[in-house]
Design a protein with these regions (language model features):
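A general structural detector for well-ordered alpha-helical segments in enzyme core domains, enriched
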Residues: 27, 52-55, 75, 79-83, ...
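N-terminal [4Fe-4S]-dependent radical SAM core
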Residues: 4, 11-12, 151, 157-205
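Residue-level signal for the nucleotide or nucleotide-sugar donor/cofactor binding architecture
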Residues: 47, 121, 171, 232, ...
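Glycine-rich beta-alpha loop elements in corrinoid/cobalamin-binding modules
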Residues: 30-169, 383-385, 389
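Glycine- and acidic-residue-enriched helix-capping/strand-helix junction motifs
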Residues: 12-24
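Conserved C-terminal portion of the radical SAM core fold
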Residues: 47, 63-65, 91-93, 238-241, ...
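Radical SAM [4Fe-4S] cluster-binding motif and immediate context
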Residues: 179-349, 369
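C-terminal accessory regions of radical SAM enzymes
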Residues: 4-13, 153-158, 162, 362-459
Length: 459
């Protein structure tokens, strides 16, 4: 079957896409392995409804899979409308973070014109669904429950009823095909790694694990990939890195998984194998969890193998707010770890959010003061967004006394349901003040760097 895998056609709600979508790449590889003709299109690279219509008419895919983030619900609804107007007989399947975290009935009510949703990991489910559609036809008279009952994570409707199957996860990640890199080629994206000194080569995301045991109040990743961490073997990771390095000229890697450093032996083996293979690369990663494995010895090895930056998901500088978030690492530990990382030559980025449940101006000021006190190379602030499947989502349902949320009304910068004691307008005002402070700080750093460079030149 001919399949289009895509994101919704949308104007940039937050940041434009900087690098390939791993999820679509994994699904494309799975479909290709089953003999399907898969196409991946990132319409955020050129968000034109007219070009989308032309592509649909010229290629006429039989099935279209759309990856949906909560911030893109309205754009997805519009994209589905365009598909229905252009290709009436096409089967539409939605998947990704928002469907995975949403209640099945609420989800299908929000997307009345889609045929199916897949929750959780779809490498097995999507080909299974296509096989069922191909063999029996979408309008087959066979009872709905019998036709689809064995497809993990599937959600579908029949008349006024919505049916759903339990999510199933792949436990041996080495058995999953690498993403279909020829369809999500890193050379098509224009992005550079912060802290990088390499002047050549492309940048690519990669993951080494799935799942996260964390219970952060703002995160729904456990709804997609579970709480148990599943690991790829270091040899499997290096095999994919070598493919990207040798075939696609990738010299910079971003490890995107939540728990990259959770298995110390795997982390060390990956670093040692990079050195053994003599790969001239640079890489970074984000750490949302405990920092115990980032010791002096490990950080030294990481630096020698190419690690140039570590992004820390600190989120808040208020101990009170951190308890609400279910973060167990203390601010004292974080401050000490930042110094250890920097002492080993690795740059540090820090992510913070404002607007947590019942957070006041006092706690937000504690966060900003702590953030600006850290010796880090990058600071980034965002507003906490109540995603489905999170404790924050349950909190706003109780606070605002409703059972159904109009996700299409959500905007990543202006939620109609703020979770803190501040309104969306007040939170945005505070974020603007923080952004101005960041600009002044960055300008100061640039001036200092130029002065130091001039001093070295004239010595």
């Amino acid at each position: 079957m001919k399949i289009l895998l895509t994101v919704p056609v949308t104007s940039f709600v937050s940041d434009p896409p900087n690098f390939p979508d791993l999820g679509l790449g994994y699904i494309a590889a799975s479909l290709k392995n089953k003999g399907h003709e898969a196409h991946v299109r990132d319409w955020n690279m050129d968000p034109s409804h007219e070009k989308f219509k032309v592509w649909l008419m010229e290629n006429r895919p039989e099935v279209i899979g759309i990856k949906v983030f909560t911030k893109d619900v309205a754009a997805t609804q519009k994209t589905i409308t365009i598909i229905r107007e252009t290709l009436r007989g096409t089967t539409i399947v939605i998947g990704g973070p928002h469907p995975s975290a949403s209640e099945p009935t609420d989800l299908m009510n929000d997307f009345v014109d889609c045929d199916f949703a897949i929750r959780g990991e779809a490498e097995e489910s999507f080909p299974f669904l296509l096989s069922e559609i191909k063999n029996t036809g979408l309008k087959d008279a066979k009872p709905e429950k019998e036709r689809y009952k064995n497809i993990p994570g599937l959600v579908w409707r029949k008349g006024g009823d919505v049916f759903s199957n339990p999510i199933s996860l792949c436990h041996n990640l080495d058995n999953i095909d690498f993403p279909c890199w020829e369809m999500i080629n890193p050379k098509d994206y224009f992005f550079d790694m912060l802290g990088s000194t390499l002047k050549e080569g492309y940048i690519s995301p990669i993951i080494t694990t799935r799942g996260c045991p964390g219970k952060c109040c703002f995160c729904c990743v456990h709804k997609i990939s579970g709480r148990k961490i599943r690991y790829r073997s270091p040899s499997n990771v290096l095999k994919e890195m070598s493919l990207l390095y040798n075939k696609y000229n990738v010299k910079k890697f971003m490890f995107m998984d939540n728990c990259f450093t959770s298995h110390k032996e795997n982390l060390i083996k990956i670093c040692e194998d990079i050195l053994k293979e003599k790969m001239i690369i640079e890489w970074d990663f984000v750490s949302y969890e405990k920092l115990d494995n980032l010791t002096d010895a490990t950080l030294s090895l990481m630096y020698r193998s190419g690690c140039r930056m570590i992004h820390l998901g600190i989120e808040s500088g208020s101990e009170k707010t951190r308890k609400v978030m279910n973060k167990s690492t203390s601010l004292k530990e974080i401050t000490e770890k930042v110094k250890v990382i920097k002492d080993n030559g690795i740059k540090v980025g820090a992510f913070f959010m404002i607007g947590f449940p019942e957070e006041t101006i006092k706690e937000i000021r504690e966060t900003t003061n702590y953030a600006f006190s850290l010796d880090v190379d990058l600071l980034k602030f965002t507003i906490c967004f109540p995603l489905p499947g999170t404790q924050n989502y349950d909190y706003i349902k109780e606070k605002y006394k409703f059972s159904i949320i109009n996700w299409a009304s959500f905007n990543i910068k202006d939620s109609p349901y703020p979770v803190s004691q501040l309104s969306s307008k007040e939170l945005n005002r505070m974020l603007n003040v923080i952004s101005l402070r960041l600009c002044l700080l960055n300008a100061r750093k640039i001036v200092i760097r130029k002065i130091m460079k001039a001093v070295r030149i004239f010595k």
